[in-house]
């Protein structure tokens, strides 16, 4: 995590001084190759937290993301008034401060006897995925996680286009909608994950949360009022309880020295979803907004995402049923 944080600071420095597209792309490549801060933070949480408390703490990581989702663009816009480079220098300073804090304050999460020696073959995400997928308890959750990630990336992919095309939103209204989502997501992750787990348990939190996501996606697909969509946004963010609960379920299926490997695989699956989802969702969006032979339906990608989430729910419920049917 410290190495990734240090390289993150270097990346922001390169972005600040980049004077051509090639240096900019180099900085982005470096970031992609070393972007392990989030997955290692989750692995660290898994290492130091008893199994029953992991989902709630994973939710707190999600809450931090929600806060950053709101504050990052706002602070970046203010700094950009000083210069285009100022936001990158500020991000470099934050990453550097994070590195210093981690180096001097954060202890190692596992004792030496429980750490696994580095294996280059397991560092390959495909090899790691293959190894984890061979574990019966992880096959179905990993597939559910991937399908869910592809579906939920619809928000990042077409949200701005959807608001502008369907409701004539200005850039300010799009920004407002994103701020509402970020605040709602942070509140949901910080305050709702733990009560949901306590009342429902991890298993029901996952599939009920996914059903909640399906309802939200269908509504976004068919609503014709921009105001109604803005009102719906806080409720769409509540479906965020699914991911920490599902991560906690999967973390119980691996040994203590494989938590980092699991989180790395989940990060790789997220990356795959971030490649596939834009390709599919933008094609569907264009098909239903620019093709005169099709009905005008800007929300079509959300309906596709709802269909994918339905598949994920069916797979997850089938897994739960098969596990409950096993003899004790």
Q: Where on the chain are the PLM-derived regions?
A:
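Helix-breaking motifs and short loop linkers at transmembrane-helix boundaries and internal kinks
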Residues: 17-22, 34, 168, 222-224
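Multi-pass alpha-helical transporter architecture, strongest
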Residues: 99-105, 303-328
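Juxtamembrane intracellular "pre-TM" segments in multi-pass secondary transporters
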Residues: 107-144, 166
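Helix-to-loop junctions at the C-terminal end of transmembrane segments
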Residues: 188-202
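Short amphipathic helix-loop junctions that connect adjacent transmembrane helices
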Residues: 157-174
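Cytoplasmic helix-loop-helix junction between adjacent transmembrane helices
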Residues: 27-66
């Amino acid at each position: 995590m410290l190495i990734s944080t240090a390289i993150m600071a270097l990346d922001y420095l390169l972005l600040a001084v980049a004077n051509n597209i090639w240096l900019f792309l180099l900085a982005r490549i470096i970031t992609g190759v070393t972007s392990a801060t989030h997955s290692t933070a989750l692995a660290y949480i898994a290492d130091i937290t008893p199994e029953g408390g992991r989902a709630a703490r994973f939710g707190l990581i999600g809450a931090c993301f929600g806060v950053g989702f709101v504050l990052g663009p706002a602070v970046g816009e203010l700094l950009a008034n000083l210069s285009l480079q100022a936001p990158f220098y500020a991000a470099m300073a934050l990453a550097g401060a994070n590195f210093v804090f981690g180096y001097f304050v954060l202890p190692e999460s596992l004792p030496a006897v429980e750490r696994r020696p580095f294996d280059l073959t397991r560092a390959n995400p495909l090899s790691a995925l293959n190894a984890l997928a061979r574990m019966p308890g992880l096959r179905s959750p990993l597939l559910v996680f991937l399908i869910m990630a592809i579906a939920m990336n619809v928000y990042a992919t077409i949200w701005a286009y959807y608001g502008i095309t369907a409701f004539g939103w200005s850039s300010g209204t799009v920004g407002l909608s994103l701020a509402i989502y970020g605040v709602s997501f942070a509140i949901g992750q910080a305050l709702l994950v733990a009560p949901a787990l306590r009342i429902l348990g991890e298993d029901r939190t996952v599939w009920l949360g996914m059903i909640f996501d399906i309802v939200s996606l269908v509504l976004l697909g068919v609503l014709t009022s921009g105001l109604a969509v803005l009102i719906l946004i806080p409720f769409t963010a509540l479906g965020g309880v699914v991911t920490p609960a599902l991560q906690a379920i999967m973390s119980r299926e691996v040994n203590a020295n494989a938590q980092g490997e699991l989180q790395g695989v989940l990060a790789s699956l997220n990356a795959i979803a971030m490649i596939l989802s834009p390709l599919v969702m933008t094609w569907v969006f264009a098909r239903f907004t620019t093709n005169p032979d099709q009905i005008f339906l800007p929300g079509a990608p959300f309906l596709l995402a709802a269909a994918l989430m339905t598949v994920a729910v069916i797979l997850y419920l089938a897994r739960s049923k098969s596990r409950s049917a096993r003899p004790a």
